[in-house]
């Protein structure tokens, strides 16, 4: 058997459009405060073809939100975000850019909500909002390293609604989901240990 080349492997990919998309992507880092100020952020990603939003509504509990903020303070790894960077043209650097969130809506919404003082974390039994933090602590949230996989889309070569769905499914449903019984069993251990 002859060697298999990268070109040959790419030809086996049945989703030709995804090969095109994958060649127009990159890994970058953002800081929440700059990300929020520099881009139009599309949290819902409306799929015009289907009259439906790609993203579910915000569903995280207060505890989940607080845990994410603590994770940032503690320097724990945060999973990468996935965005589609959409601009009308590759050539115009001064235009408005929209960042569509493909993966990470709950996390990014939580970060923005904390920055807007919409919920507190608990420190020594006291509620602590973003406004209550000193400059260094606020800096930790405003400028934490938000790693992201970014797919680039332009009016002359846009990422289609179908392609957005395929990318979303890749990041959200590609693995084997945990069995409910296994998940409940693990949660039961936590319930026992906190009593």
Question: Residue ranges of each PLM-predicted region?
Answer:
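A short, surface-exposed helix-loop junction/capping segment
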Residues: 44-53
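N-terminal extension/subdomain marker
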Residues: 1-42
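Basic- and aromatic-enriched surface patches that contact anionic nucleotides/nucleic acids
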Residues: 6-7, 18, 54-195
